[in-house]
Amino acid sequence: MSIMMLPMEQKIQWVPTSLQDITAVLGTEAYTEEDKSMVSHAQKSQHSCLSHSRWLRSPQVTGGSWDLRIRPSKDSSSFRQAQCLRKDPGANNHLESQGVRGTAGDADRELRGPSEKATAGQPRVTLLPTPHVSGLSQEFESHWPEIAERSPCVAGVIPVIYYSVLLGLGLPVSLLTAVALARLATRTRRPSYYYLLALTASDIIIQVVIVFAGFLLQGAVLARQVPQAVVRTANILEFAANHASVWIAILLTVDRYTALCHPLHHRAASSPGRTRRAIAAVLSAALLTGIPFYWWLDMWRDTDSPRTLDEVLKWAHCLTVYFIPCGVFLVTNSAIIHRLRRRGRSGLQPRVGKSTAILLGITTLFTLLWAPRVFVMLYHMYVAPVHRDWRVHLALDVANMVAMLHTAANFGLYCFVSKTFRATVRQVIHDAYLPCTLASQPEGMAAKPVMEPPGLPTGAEV
């Protein structure tokens, strides 16, 4: 610690040369290594600390407590003089001879603060937290920038109502779709119906595992108070169902592309047995690719910055479920549309089959409905986490609701495009309603068949 002798009209400057000098000014030498690091950090980011604390930005601390403003020139130099004079009496005598005694005395009184009578019954302010201090003051703590509360669920009960309606309407509709497609696949033995049946089965699994078990049971009923092993095992089934649904749609896309662009090869290669084997291979691959997501972290509970494993799993999910499938959809659908336009320019009628129209509708619907979820997931990973920003929390809730809508929207698309599907659905409903009607009629009132086998004449004997 050094004192520079200057003329009387200039100020005495004091330059700290080590952490010991700073702790000496603060009035104690018993600082731990953690406190030294805090002092060093405060020395580097003084402006940042002042900008984050309304308490330090106030003009003064009222109520008889210490004045903690950062004072330029006179007061701060006097404060430094007083501490130096206490350590060096010789320097004190020398300064008195130069006429600086009044300045040092004022600074010394400022260092000691108000008198005991003036400060009786008033709270004291600690400049830096020490190991013996229980915590920061309440006013300081309320403006501490590093502490952030968990973001509230702004949507409230709307997701619960939405998923309940989606499950109550979507699951019966999906079961009806599966029965109708099973009849069409058995009757026609066309590969496209087998692929649509497998796609519907995957949507049913998504509704049961994700919508019912995930959002409603774990989220709403149990409030996420579920054993971690159960949650992680459910993650495998959820991601496997998502992968199966998307990649079966890719099989349908490739089948339609081959049927339109390479019809001879499609007729020679397509068969019900080969179609079933392709579906079984995709389902097995989907289950295997869902196993790594056992370590998937819930974004509502993920309070730390994403680790390497988290980033790998989130990027794998985005690539497997959205980016790669959308790339395949874009290429194959563009080739199909280009083929149909060429037929129109050559004078032939560009006939668009029902399966092709259903394919274009399914892929377009999937691309639009899943885009918000993927965007919010990447935003959560690199910009703002869900648990800190209520807007990201709300965006993730809405994105999940929109993404789950595709599991029930396919039925309306099938009915809108295909007259054969509508007729099959009516037949399924009629067949299910007729036994219930016959069972509800009294005994002896059942309708007789229109055509009766011929019997023996009355009075005739065998």
UniProtKB/Swiss-Prot annotation:
The chain crosses the membrane at residues 153-173, 196-216, 234-254, 279-299, 317-337, 358-378, 398-418. Residues 174-195, 255-278, 338-357, 419-462 are cytoplasmic. It is a multi-pass membrane protein. It is found in: Cell membrane. GO terms for cellular component: cell junction; cytosol; plasma membrane. PROSITE patterns: G_PROTEIN_RECEP_F1_1 (PS00237), G_PROTEIN_RECEP_F1_2 (PS50262). It comes from the Eukaryota. Keywords: Cell membrane, G-protein coupled receptor, Membrane, Receptor, Transducer, Transmembrane, Transmembrane helix. The keyword Ligase does not apply. Its main location: membrane. Disulfide bonds: none annotated. Residues 106-115 have a biased composition (Basic and acidic residues). It holds the Pfam family 7tm_1. InterPro entries: GPCR_Rhodpsn, GPCR_Rhodpsn_7TM, Orphan_GPCR1. Orphan receptor. Belongs to the G-protein coupled receptor 1 family. This is Probable G-protein coupled receptor 142. The lineage of its organism: Eukaryota, Metazoa, Chordata, Craniata, Vertebrata.
